[in-house]
Amino acid sequence: KLKLLQTGGPLGGVLSADSMSIHLDFEEMREAGAILGSGGIIVGNEDVCAVDLTRVLVAFCQFESCGKCFPCRLGMEHLLEITERIARCESQPGDLELMQSIGGTMETSALCGHGQLGFGPIRSALTHFDDDFKAHIEEKRCPTGGCAGPRFVPKNTRPFATDFVPGDQNAR
């Protein structure tokens, strides 16, 4: 049975099966909390955990951050740490509020679309799959069992842009 749709690539939204009636239109997608982005669509059944999918999307976005602006570089790192804690059923009080605060800061102060859209997958997943998040946070269990076991998540933001540091070292 269809559970979720993830649209627009890693920065896109995670939508519920109820969203199947939405047209692939910029305005309708934005109203639903998603974007068309790259045009990619991931379809997930009942065996897919929305928290785990969100963790994978956030990990990709964090890894792809260029590191030039503070809100995205540190914001994505913190969002990944929190999302991983939730996926491991080890969340701390205030984690969701902290995610909202970090996401809001990124949306208003990141220098490019990557940082400004980086909170989108989390926001839409929280909106459409709050039951999955509640199971991880309150019941300390993954409803699908999909978050159990070790996972490889790259945790390196690209090296900070040293080419833009003023001084003689750039002449080398």
Locate each region found by the language model:
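Redox cofactor-anchoring modules in respiratory/redox and cofactor-processing assemblies
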Residues: 1-171
